[in-house]
Regions:
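Acidic, glycine-rich low-complexity segments with interspersed aromatic residues
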Residues: 89-95, 127-129, 133-135, 139-159, ...
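Catalytic cores of histone-lysine modification enzymes
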Residues: 492-609
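Intrinsically disordered, low-complexity acidic/polar tracts
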Residues: 359-362, 367-465
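Short, Lys/Arg- and Gly-enriched loop/turn segments at beta-strand edges
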Residues: 323-330, 532-538, 640-652
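Conserved SET/PR-domain catalytic core that frames the SAM/AdoMet-binding pocket
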Residues: 335-346, 505-538, 621-640
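Compact mixed alphabeta submodule
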Residues: 325-382, 626
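Extended, intrinsically disordered, low-complexity regulatory segments of metazoan chromatin-modifying
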Residues: 1-133
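C-terminal interaction modules of eukaryotic adaptor/scaffold proteins
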Residues: 620, 628-666
Length: 666
């Protein structure tokens, strides 16, 4: 041991004197080793037993916050035993490499010994590490998370953590695709790298483990990666479908289930929107060729069994097929459930499997039920209540845009001509040697011979799935003047709608826009189509780049990736001349996006050449992950006198209902 004890010494447990040795002549109660729970120092970082990709240290996501307390008396050294790594689907470990549980009194406990091949470090050494980690909770350019917010978050903190994680992931994807990462940072899993950076910086929330709802996470929220759920405390396991902790009362300790993920790996019945038949974890998951072995009542299965007796609330996350990317899944938080019953039945491999019947608690907002309804509307198996038009675009869009009013008797918005292009656009000149690139087939990320990539400061603005990496002063896309193919990935804003949109009547803000599909942060939504005008005489159906807009940060923080800040593109837009677009007579779905002071959509100026001239376009992208049937909104901005002061006249009263509402817009 590092403390320098002699071979036959035993640490004393009291605060007493001198030698601190135990009197060996005293009779003590002896228990079998297997009945003893390991005693671990609070500040010790535990290592994970799961195997991770080469080049990645284990993740340590949840840890006990440092408390201001007097130095405790010497503790007995923790007992450690080796356990072989568990199978990926069996493992109850989270990104912290352990269950890191707490009892009902809020004390951190653990349910199993951890493997160790190195001598244990002293508490003093571990304490130094914690202090360093806590100093890094505030990240330059991103904002800080207090120690209290690390334990218990809120909506704003949860959004900040998710946006910071996703901005890092997008940047790492961009670097990976352009082959600019060195061998140390290079990885095919940018999400793991981003998660590791966030963990090392202590940038996370809801670390305090709890039964029931998680502060700042709302029913219906969507996640595109399990790591996202880990970093906001919704589900602490990056691989396992069952998350649990050890609860302690006066008589005993027992595992209690916190959350489950039903993602189709096991043979789960998920057809009913309020009932879920969940299969336990173990040997027999949906594989006919596996040797018949009964599942064991241990770890997550035992936690579910105990929770069925305790009748505690369990968070349920449903993994569903992404309607846009068929090979991916979207995770939707479906709220709180209780286990009504459990039983054992024969699985497909012939072994016994545990089954648990989860029943959703009443009075919660609909989540999975919304997905089920959308599925029926898309297949035509159920009629849409309040449907006025099946396709408002009359075939202009490749995906139909429905028009719905289930609020009142209004039959539709005022007449206009649907168009998905910009009319009467005014060209402007740039100091460029050419109006297009000479790439064969499609432009390739990292190819600095491509003139369009050069105009984007050497970065390909989008990653492979069409997600925008960063806000830029201008995004230079390939256009009709370029020699690359029309399906070039640098033409994202010219490819039309990718999600099925619906124009609907709101309760108090006229007509609005929403999507049948979940939308990932950075996804292109639509262009603002209409007529370019010199001056806006009216305030309705007008987009104006000269307005004053609230600043916000969306890009990754370069210091997290050890990049030089001076080489990073600013988020301030650079527009050669003001662009004003009216969609009153001609327009597309963008005209129906309402204003919000806390929007979920932002606009980005995009430039490409047509007919030997450059034209400016306004493209809209998702600011964060947007659940299906959520209204899409952006900041309309405020008018300006010309001397820098905002003009109150002509403004409209804001009804966005946001906690950050500024009262008016336009």
């Amino acid at each position: 041991m590092e403390e320098g004890l002699c071979e036959n010494s035993v640490p004393g447990s009291g605060s007493g004197s001198g030698s601190g040795l135990v009197d060996r002549t005293r009779i003590v109660e002896v228990k079998p080793l297997r009945s003893l729970a390991p005693v671990l120092p609070k500040s010790l970082h535990l290592s994970a037993s799961r195997r991770y990709p080469s080049g990645f240290p284990p993740f340590v996501l949840f840890e006990e916050p440092q408390e201001s307390q007097p130095s405790p008396p010497p503790m007995p050294a923790p007992i450690r035993a080796f356990r072989k790594p568990l199978d990926e689907e069996e493992s109850p470990r989270g990104v912290n490499g352990g269950t890191n549980m707490e009892d009902v009194n809020g004390k951190s406990v653990d349910d199993s010994p951890k493997p160790s091949t190195k001598p244990m470090k002293s508490c003093k050494s571990s304490q130094k590490k914690r202090t360093k980690s806590q100093d890094l909770v505030s990240i330059s350019g991103v904002g800080g998370i207090s120690m209290a917010q690390r334990d218990d978050g809120d909506r704003e903190v949860v959004n900040l953590v998710l946006m910071t994680f996703d901005s890092l992931r997008r940047r790492l994807c961009q670097l990976e695709e352009s082959k600019e990462l060195n061998t140390i940072m290079g990885t095919k899993r940018p999400d793991l790298r981003a998660s590791n950076v966030m963990t090392n910086k202590g940038f996370r929330t809801n670390m305090r483990r709890r039964v029931g709802a998680v502060p700042g996470v709302e029913i219906g929220d969507v996640f595109f990666l399990r790591m996202e759920m880990c970093h906001v405390g919704l589900h602490g396991q990056s691989m396992s479908g069952i998350d649990y902790m050890i609860a302690k009362d006066e008589l005993q300790e027992e595992p209690v289930a916190l959350s489950i993920v039903s993602s189709g790996v096991y043979d789960n019945d998920a057809e009913d929107e309020d009932v879920l038949i969940y299969t336990g974890q173990g040997e027999n998951f949906n594989k006919k060729d596996k040797h018949a072995v009964d599942q064991k009542l241990q770890r997550g299965n035992l936690a579910l069994d105990k929770s069925s007796h305790r009748q505690n609330e369990v968070r349920v996350i449903r993994g569903l097929r992404d309607s846009v990317n068929k090979s991916a899944k979207v995770y939707v938080y479906d709220g709180l459930y209780k286990i009504q019953s459990s039983w054992i039945e024969k699985g497909k491999s012939g072994g016994g499997v545990f089954k648990y019947k989860f029943v959703r608690l009443p009075g919660q907002p609909s989540a999975f039920g919304v997905w089920k309804s959308i599925q029926k509307w898309k297949t035509g198996s159920s009629s849409r209540t309040g449907l006025i038009l099946a396709d408002l675009s009359t075939g202009v869009e490749s995906i139909p845009v429905s028009l719905v009013n289930d609020v009142d008797n209004e039959k539709g918005p005022s007449f206009f001509t649907y168009s998905n292009s910009l009319r009467d656009s005014k060209p402007f000149s740039l100091v460029q040697s050419s109006y297009g690139c000479n790439c064969n087939k499609t432009c390739v990320p990292g190819d600095l011979s491509c003139s369009c990539i050069q105009r984007n400061e050497g970065d390909f603005p989008y990653i492979a799935n069409g997600i925008l990496v960063s806000r830029r002063p201008l995004v230079h896309e390939c256009g009709p003047m370029c020699k690359c193919f029309p399906n070039c990935k640098n033409r994202v804003s010219q490819t039309g709608l990718k999600h099925q949109m619906e124009v609907f009547k709101t309760e108090n803000r006229g007509w609005g826009l929403r999507s049948f599909d979940p939308i990932r942060a950075g996804t292109f939504i639509c262009e603002y189509a209409g007529e370019v005008i010199d001056r806006a005489n009216e305030n309705e159906y007008v987009f104006d780049t000269s307005r004053i807009y609230n600043p916000f940060k969306w890009n990754y923080e370069p210091s997290l990736l050890e990049e030089i800040s001076s080489n990073v593109t600013t988020e301030d837009y650079t527009i050669p001349s003001p662009l004003i677009i009216s969609s009153k007579n001609f327009g597309n779905v963008a005209r129906y996006m309402n204003h919000s002071c806390s929007p979920n959509v932002f606009w980005q100026p995009v430039l490409y050449a047509e007919n030997n001239q450059y034209f400016l376009h306004i493209a809209f992208f998702a600011l964060r992950h947007i659940p299906p049937m959520t209204e899409l909104t952006y900041d309309y901005g405020c008018s300006d006198h010309g001397d820098g002061s905002s003009a109150p006249q002509g403004r409209k009263k804001c009804l966005c209902g946001s906690s950050k509402c500024r009262g008016s817009f336009g």
